[in-house]
């Protein structure tokens, strides 16, 4: 008797025909115009484009922080768009890591406590904190507070927090924007290492180095996407 093949795992991140409008008085801005993308495990997708092209808006919609006016976003097969905030927060906690130019660290908690906080919200098996800190070269800084970290350490600590819940998808918005070239190269090496663990990574950036490191590049111009 033939054994049925196991079903394929769901796509880590899929967005279809995203539209997002912003209104200010009588003026209306179309920030996203029919943007679609599919990001598989191990992909590193760079989202490029000039300031105001829709990069941050796209990442906010992908993370479920902002709801598109049209279209749908699925993470690990679950629809995150057009859901209650409680449902979106639950999906984010389980499947999404977020990394921004300003590190996503609680100032009153040390590095280890920041990781523990994220892991407590994940409700799923998480990356072992000592292993994660060791991978990022922070094993001797776990008791340090954000204001005690250098710029490079702060970037790595932000990445550690973003990876603490073993995310299916990592979304990064200008993560290297304020770093010198050497530190930027190190952070990019770490992001590539993350893809080797099977994580789908999307990075919005102006940096040519980020685009060069990506497996695919999505360029936004006035909210329109071009691969």
Model-derived segments and spans:
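ABC ATPase NBD coupling module
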Residues: 26-29, 80-97, 196
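The feature captures the beta-strand-to-loop junction immediately N-terminal to the Walker
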Residues: 48-50
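Helix-to-loop junction immediately C-terminal to a conserved catalytic motif
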Residues: 63
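Conserved ABC transporter NBD signature motif
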Residues: 71-79
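Conserved ABC ATPase signature
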Residues: 145-149, 153
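A short, proline-enriched helix->beta-strand linker immediately N-terminal to the Walker B motif
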Residues: 164-168
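Catalytic Walker B motif of ABC-type/P-loop ATPase nucleotide-binding domains
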Residues: 170-173
């Amino acid at each position: 008797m033939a054994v049925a093949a196991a079903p394929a795992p769901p796509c880590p991140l899929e967005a279809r025909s995203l539209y997002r409008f912003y209104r200010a008085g009588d003026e209306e801005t179309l920030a996203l115009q029919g943007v679609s993308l599919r990001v598989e495990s191990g992909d590193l997708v760079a989202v490029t484009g000039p300031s105001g092209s829709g990069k941050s808006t796209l990442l906010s919609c992908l993370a479920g922080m902002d709801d598109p006016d049209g279209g749908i976003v699925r993470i690990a097969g679950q629809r995150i768009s057009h859901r209650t905030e409680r449902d979106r927060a639950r999906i984010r906690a389980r499947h999404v890591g977020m990394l921004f130019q300003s590190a996503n660290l609680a100032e009153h908690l040390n590095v280890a406590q920041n990781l523990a906080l994220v892991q407590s919200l994940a409700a799923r098996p998480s990356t072992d904190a000592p292993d994660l800190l060791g991978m990022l070269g922070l094993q001797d800084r776990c008791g340090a507070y954000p204001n005690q970290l250098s710029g490079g350490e702060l970037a790595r600590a932000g990445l550690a927090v973003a990876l603490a819940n073993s995310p299916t998808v990592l979304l990064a918005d200008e993560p290297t924007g304020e770093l010198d070239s050497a530190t930027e190269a190190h952070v990019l090496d770490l992001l590539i290492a993350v893809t080797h663990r099977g994580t789908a990574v999307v990075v919005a950036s102006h940096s040519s180095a980020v685009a060069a490191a990506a497996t695919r590049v999505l360029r936004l111009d006035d909210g329109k996407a071009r691969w």
